[in-house]
Regions:
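A short, basic N-terminal segment
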Residues: 1-39, 44, 204-229
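Walker A/P-loop nucleotide-binding motif
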Residues: 45-61
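Post-Walker A helix-loop "phosphate-sensing" segment adjacent to the P-loop in P-loop NTPases
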Residues: 66-77
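Conserved nucleotide-sensing/catalytic segment adjacent to the nucleotide-binding pocket
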Residues: 84-124
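Short regulatory helix/loop adjacent to the ATP-binding pocket of P-loop NTPases
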Residues: 128-143
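Conserved AAA+ ATPase "SRH/arginine-finger" region at the nucleotide-binding site
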Residues: 145-157
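Conserved small helical "lid"/interfacial subdomain of P-loop NTPases
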Residues: 154-174
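C-terminal helical "lid" of AAA+/P-loop NTPase domains
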Residues: 179-183, 190-204
């Protein structure tokens, strides 16, 4: 078995990802969602749902919209004051399918938004018709919402995202290295985040540059982890 280079524990420095409107990477798969955000408050309906896979850019778009509107984050659970908050201004409910919600509470939020002319943005990995809704009135309200889907990233977007993620960590990388990664990685922005995070960690711990060999090791690790799941 090949012995791996000695790894030291790297110092952890904070590296906040750039998440403003000017940092948003534009591609065909994001164009509809970006248009919705940019056209606030002239939305086709007061409730908008952005649906897409993990790491597809939903959180970035939601963050931009929240900065634009001053929206409050809500979680419509039983007994919450989410509907009252929605009556006063725009509200954001992220990761709907993962966080879960109370049917009646979300129904009242949507009614409050419609009655008071505010706005509700929700993000989800699943389309709303796949949510576990049992309240017929809520299902009817969700059918009236505007749903925008974000698809899987293409090579061009993955390349842009990798360069951005490396730049967020103040790392300079060769175009050929990025092309190597793009050609071999899973088509997912979440995977791009994992690749950059792991590459940065290994390079720091071993005191080495970002190389093709290091990238190959990281990609193999991630592939093996997927096979083990």
């Amino acid at each position: 078995m090949t012995k791996r280079p000695y790894e030291q524990l790297p110092l952890v420095f904070r590296h906040d990802p750039a998440s403003g409107r000017e940092d948003l990477l534009v591609s065909d798969r994001l164009s509809a969602a970006i248009a919705i955000i940019d056209h606030w408050p002239d939305w086709p309906s007061p409730v908008v749902i952005i649906a897409g896979p993990v790491g597809s850019g939903k959180s970035h778009l939601a963050s931009i919209w929240r900065q634009m509107t001053g929206a409050e984050v809500i979680h419509p659970t039983a007994g919450s004051n989410a509907a009252d908050i929605a009556s006063a201004g725009p509200v954001l409910f992220e990761d709907v399918d993962r966080q879960g919600f109370d049917d009646t509470a979300l129904f009242h939020v949507i009614n409050s938004v419609r009655q008071n002319g505010t706005g509700l943005l929700m993000t989800s990995r699943l389309w709303p018709m796949s949510w576990p809704v049992t309240l017929p009135d809520l299902r009817s309200r969700l059918k009236a919402a505007t749903v925008v889907e974000i698809g899987e990233p293409d090579d061009e977007l993955l390349t842009q995202v990798l360069f951005k993620l490396f730049a967020d960590r103040q790392l300079l990388v060769d175009e050929r290295l990025v092309a190597y990664i793009v050609n071999r990685m899973e088509r997912s922005l979440a995977t791009a985040q994992l690749v950059v995070e792991r590459l940065d960690h290994l390079a720091l711990s071993r005191g080495t540059r970002l190389t093709r060999a290091l990238a190959a090791e990281v990609l193999d690790e991630l592939a093996n982890a997927r096979c083990a799941d």
